[in-house]
Amino acid sequence: MQTGLSLACLVLLCSVLGEAALRKPKRQAGATDTNGAAKSEPAPVKTKGLKTLDRGWGEDIEWAQTYEEGLAKARENNKPLMVIHHLEDCPYSIALKKAFVADKMAQKLAQEDFIMLNLVHPVADENQSPDGHYVPRVIFIDPSLTVRSDLKGRYGNKLYAYDADDIPELITNMKKAKSFLKTEL
């Protein structure tokens, strides 16, 4: 049931993203430059409902925009990449997000020691879903771009899942990801 629901959510998400990608931005009527040619000016930004890269996971954290950017920054900065897979309307994802934001140690580690990425859509790299496409799940990648399969949550059936009550376990794994990097180099 859970796998079927997750798959249905992914299919729906993909169709919505595909439809949004096909839409073209509209030009403002009457906008011309000094030669009378139409100017392509961006539409005014609406602040209500504005989506930011943090998606509520911590506004003081610098977030990578894409998986590829996160991998490049991890390698360049010699820091581990922490990828949080979630859905914005998933109650488990929402609860984990609130707990993550409320925990000062988790926020501090994320700000100082990690390249951070949160994704609401699947990536093509199957290493990001070694045991399924469930959410929320957290995957760590070291600067050599190796997925840290040893850094798991406490569940046997969903190895990389974390609940809101699992923040101490997540922090432990964040510290392991960071300290492993230092002993390895």
UniProtKB/Swiss-Prot annotation:
Name of the gene this protein is made from: ag2
GO terms of biological process kind: cement gland development; fibroblast growth factor receptor signaling pathway
Gene Ontology terms: cellular component: endoplasmic reticulum; extracellular region
Localization: Secreted
Tissue expression from the record: Expressed in the anterior of the dorsal ectoderm from late gastrula stages onwards. Becomes restricted to the cement gland anlage at the onset of neurulation (stages 13 to 14) and expressed exclusively in the cement gland from stage 18 onwards, with transient expression in the hatching gland during tailbud stages.
Induction: In response to organizer-secreted signals and neural inducers.
Secretion signal, residue range per the UniProt entry: 1-18
Protein name: Anterior gradient protein 2
SUPFAM superfamilies, per database record: Thioredoxin-like
Protein function: Involved in cement gland formation; probably specifies dorsal ectoderm to acquire an anterior fate such as cement gland and forebrain. Signals via the FGF pathway.
Stretch list, region Disordered: 25-45
Organism: Xenopus laevis
Keywords tagged on the record: Developmental protein, Secreted, Signal
One annotated GO molecular function: dystroglycan binding
One Pfam family cited in the UniProt record for this chain: Thioredoxin_7
Family according to the record: Belongs to the AGR family.
